[in-house]
């Protein structure tokens, strides 16, 4: 009777071996490793997805920072205004200076040809001189207008520099003040050149008036001569007529 259970167990084992072949140890290990890799991959991916991702937000700007930004923009705008007015003024002063020297040259040529021209030639040259004088006065009015705008630009830039300094925008304040000094130097140089030309023009006109008066005493000119109207049309500063 005891052999019957053993036979049953052996038969059952045989059936299992035929239906499900035994897998080698190496294949089992590989299968286990692959299974664990899949499990780990799924686990790690699930963990990463579970981590909340926060959005980066810019720090809130303080009122002081906003004021500094605003005053820096004001400083930049005032510097632009100052640059434009400086360019216009310097260019206008240069044109005026050129016109003054042109008038000086015409008057000197006119004086050197006084004894060599008839009345018609003298009148023609005098008309050219009058035209040059009108142009010079127009250019002077133009540069005076630009000078007024330039002075307002300087005042505005100075206020912007002070506002930048008071607001803590030191770099903007220093930049504007340096810009003011540079443009003031440029304008002063142009003014000096114009002043030198005006002094030479006044001296030339004074010499012409004195020469005309001397010649008129020896030989009174006929009425309506352009030379006789020189002293009436020209306004010579008293400082240039004074003899030291």
UniProtKB/Swiss-Prot annotation:
Skewed-composition ranges (Low complexity): 220-229
Listed InterPro entries: Smac/DIABLO-like_sf (IPR009062), Smac_DIABLO (IPR015142)
Residue range of the transit peptide in the UniProt record, numbered on this chain: 1-38
Family: Belongs to the Smac/DIABLO protein family.
Places the protein is found: Mitochondrion
Matching Gene3D superfamilies: 1.20.58.70
Protein name as annotated: Diablo homolog, mitochondrial
Pfam families documented for this protein: Smac_DIABLO (PF09057)
Main location: mitochondrion
Keyword annotations of the record: Apoptosis, Mitochondrion, Transit peptide
Region (Disordered): 207-244
Function: Promotes apoptosis. Acts by opposing the inhibitory activity of inhibitor of apoptosis proteins (IAP).
Complex formation: Homodimer.
Residue interval(s) of motif IAP-binding: 50-54
Gene Ontology, cellular component aspect: cytoplasm; mitochondrion
């Amino acid at each position: 009777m005891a052999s019957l259970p053993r036979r049953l167990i052996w038969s059952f084992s045989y059936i299992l071996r035929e239906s499900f072949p035994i897998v080698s140890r190496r294949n089992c290990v590989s299968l286990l490793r692959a299974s664990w890799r899949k499990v780990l991959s799924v686990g790690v991916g699930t963990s990463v997805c579970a981590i909340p991702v926060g959005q980066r937000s810019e720090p809130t700007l303080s009122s002081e920072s906003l004021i500094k930004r605003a005053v820096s923009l004001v400083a930049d705008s005032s510097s632009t205004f100052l640059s434009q007015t400086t360019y216009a003024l310097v260019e206008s002063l240069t044109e005026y200076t050129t016109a003054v020297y042109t008038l000086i040259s015409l008057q000197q040529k006119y004086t050197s040809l006084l004894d060599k021209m008839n009345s018609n030639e003298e009148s023609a040259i005098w008309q050219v001189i009058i035209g040059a004088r009108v142009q010079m006065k127009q250019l002077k009015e133009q540069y005076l207008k630009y000078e007024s705008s330039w002075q307002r630009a300087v005042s505005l830039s100075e206020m912007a520099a002070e506002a930048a300094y008071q607001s803590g925008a030191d770099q903007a304040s220093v930049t504007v003040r340096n810009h003011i000094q540079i443009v003031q130097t440029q304008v002063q140089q142009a003014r000096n050149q114009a002043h030198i030309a005006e002094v030479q023009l006044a001296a030339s006109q004074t010499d012409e008036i004195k020469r005309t008066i001397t010649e008129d005493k020896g030989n009174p000119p006929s009425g309506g001569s352009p030379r006789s109207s020189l002293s009436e049309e020209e306004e010579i500063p008293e400082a240039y007529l004074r003899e030291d």
